[in-house]
């Protein structure tokens, strides 16, 4: 499974948890990991790790300002 596929699966699992499904399962490094509603923060950290590994994160920018 590629990192992109892992990221898509992790995002789908997060969506499932956030919409009321009690348990979501993700393949992580060749093993099966189950996340529950109480481990949403762990799943978000995992998604952030995958985004870094795939180069999908962008640095946050400050608010746009109007200068005269």
From Swiss-Prot:
GO biological process: one example: viral life cycle
Name of one Pfam family that matches: gpW
Keyword line: Late protein, Viral capsid assembly, Viral release from host cell, Virion
Cell location: Virion
Main localization category: virion
Keyword Secreted among record annotations: no
Top-rank taxon: Viruses
GO cellular component, one term: virion component
Record flagged with keyword Hydrolase: no
SUPFAM superfamilies referenced in this protein's UniProt entry, alphabetically: Head-to-tail joining protein W, gpW
Similarity comment: family membership: Belongs to the lambda phage gpW family.
Subunit structure: Monomer in solution, assembles into hexamers on the prohead. May bind FII and portal protein (Potential).
NCBIfam families from the UniProt entry: phage_HTJ
Function text: Plays a role in morphogenesis of the virion head after genome packaging. Presumably interacts with the portal vertex to stabilize the packaged DNA within the head after packaging. Probably binds to the head-tail connector protein FII.
Name used for this protein in its record: Head completion protein
Organism: Escherichia phage lambda
